[in-house]
């Protein structure tokens, strides 16, 4: 018996073949129709369970959120919404989910609600789509710069530099914040700290990238960046990923051409 991802089954549609799939239950209707999703695609695969052939104790373990392994035959679907479905011959429960308390039910949830369920929200269509786009964008970013002769560099996350100089930074310290050592002027004595000086989470990899560009010509950074401005707006984030290319011998026109070409290329790739 072949083990497939749901994406493979929906693309190949090997009708008549026996298949084994694993995934999480999105819905279980009429004690008969299971909509299963394994994360390989945003689309679900319908699995038909003839409840007369299965023990009632097993069926009671199947609810939204449960993890299952289903084996059966891929057949043409007689219903609407899908072209093929699995006629289940065997169902194994990897793990159950309490139907009364499992939070991600088959309905629309607000973003505020999902923010409180961060460990499960990727199972919703909204967040699974967002993560697929982010994954494709990340790959596109690296592909673009690699194809255009850039070198990828890892800028430090913990740093003593303030590349921007105009914003608040998250401090990083191993000192006892309740009883820090003080110098002669009554200020915190960071010479006793891990690095012997003040350190913070990076606000930009610009300075490090500029030094690398002076030896490699064209480099870019792409990684997490942190800002400690306490501004609760859609344009302020405490943590985000920033792209910073640095090129030696580029003038303003070349910089603008690169920016325009980069945006066009990455968007076309994702779309």
Show where each model-derived region lies.
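Class II aminoacyl-tRNA synthetase catalytic cores and aaRS-like
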Residues: 1-271
């Amino acid at each position: 018996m072949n083990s497939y991802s749901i994406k493979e089954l929906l693309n190949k549609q090997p009708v008549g073949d026996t298949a084994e799939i694993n995934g999480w239950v999105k819905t279980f209707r009429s004690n008969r129709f299971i909509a299963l999703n394994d994360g390989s695609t945003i689309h679900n695969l319908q699995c038909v369970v003839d409840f007369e052939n299965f023990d009632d104790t097993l069926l009671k373990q199947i609810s939204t959120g449960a993890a299952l392994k289903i084996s059966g035959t891929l057949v043409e679907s007689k219903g609407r919404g899908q072209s093929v479905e699995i006629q289940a011959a065997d169902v194994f429960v990897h793990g159950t989910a309490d139907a009364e308390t499992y939070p991600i039910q088959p309905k629309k949830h607000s973003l505020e609600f999902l923010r409180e369920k961060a460990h499960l929200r990727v199972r919703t269509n909204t967040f699974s789509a967002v993560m697929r786009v982010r994954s494709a964008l990340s790959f596109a970013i690296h592909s673009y710069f690699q194809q255009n002769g850039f070198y990828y560099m890892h800028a430090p996350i913990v740093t003593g530099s303030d590349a921007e100089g105009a914003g608040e930074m998250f401090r990083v310290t191993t000192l006892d914040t309740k009883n820090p050592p003080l110098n002669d002027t009554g200020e915190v004595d960071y010479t006793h700290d891990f690095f012997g000086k003040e350190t913070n989470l990076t606000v930009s990899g610009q300075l490090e990238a500029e030094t690398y560009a002076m030896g490699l010509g064209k480099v870019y950074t792409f990684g997490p960046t942190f800002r400690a401005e306490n501004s609760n707006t859609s344009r302020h984030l405490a943590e985000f990923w920033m792209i910073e290319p640095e090129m030696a011998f580029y003038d303003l026109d070349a910089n603008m051409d690169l920016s325009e070409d980069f945006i066009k290329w990455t968007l076309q790739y994702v779309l």
